[in-house]
Regions:
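Conserved donor-binding/catalytic core segment of Leloir-type glycosyltransferases
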Residues: 25-42, 48-51, 64
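Short acidic alpha-helix that forms the nucleotide-activated donor recognition element
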Residues: 95-106, 127
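Carbohydrate-associated surface elements
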Residues: 10
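Short hydrophobic beta-strand element within catalytic cores of glycosyltransferases
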Residues: 131-134, 139-144
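A short, well-ordered alpha-helix in the C-terminal region of glycosyltransferases
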Residues: 172, 179-187
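Aromatic "clamp/platform" in nucleotide-sugar-dependent glycosyltransferases that forms part
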Residues: 114
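Nucleotide-activated donor-binding/catalytic signature segment of Leloir-type glycosyltransferases, i.e.
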Residues: 76-96
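Conserved acidic donor-binding segment of nucleotide-sugar-dependent glycosyltransferases
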Residues: 145-163, 172-177
Length: 187
């Protein structure tokens, strides 16, 4: 007889049924969303560097980093400086937001954490029908590939801190709208 049962995180998918979609300003962009705290464990610096490489190949890419920047102000400042040093356009730090106000504008989301449990941002992306790029940490592998559910993959899994691999994943999803749609439906 088991005395412990693990209950994974969950979200109310009904809250994602009627979310705003792309706006007029989004029509010429491929929006990449990152819903996270700007902290070292989320490895935002690797994300920024990978985005810089991907944007050279796909100029329409736009990265939305959505979440608080005040938890580790020094690290957030280093991220802002990195964007400036690399001279990257089209990276927006929104600060705290209501995820449902933005997620429908995204073509795919990304998570480059070096450690996770079961990230809510992946569940929120799937509830909105959006595929995910995530590092192979915590429960990300099972969330992306399923557990013998027969649905297929719902995103791309990468190694942690692998700038080239993460950039290639961004390029793949950016250049393949049908693949994005298929993966989004699988989520």
């Amino acid at each position: 007889e088991e005395k412990i049962r693990i209950t994974p995180n969950g979200i109310n998918v009904n809250g994602f049924l009627e979310i705003p979609g792309k706006t007029e300003e989004d029509q010429d962009a491929i929006n990449v969303g990152a819903v996270l705290r700007v902290t070292p464990i989320k490895d935002v610096k690797t994300m920024i560097q990978a985005f810089a490489f991907a944007k050279k190949k796909v100029p329409k890419l736009k990265l939305w980093i959505m979440g608080p920047t005040d938890e580790d102000e020094k690290y957030a400042g280093e991220c802002f400086d990195l964007v400036e040093t690399l001279g990257i356009k089209d990276i927006i730090f929104t600060g705290r937001i209501n995820v449902r106000d933005y997620i429908g504008r995204m073509d795919f989301t990304i998570l480059t954490s070096i450690s996770e449990g079961q990230p809510l941002t992946i569940l929120e992306s799937y509830a909105a029908g959006i595929p995910v790029i995530a590092t192979d940490v915590g429960n990300c592998r099972e969330l992306i590939f399923g557990n013998n559910d027969g649905l297929g993959d719902a995103g791309i899994l990468t190694h942690i801190m692998n700038i080239e691999e993460i950039a290639q994943a961004m390029i793949k999803l950016a250049e393949n709208p049908k693949e994005r749609e298929r993966m989004g439906q699988n989520g």
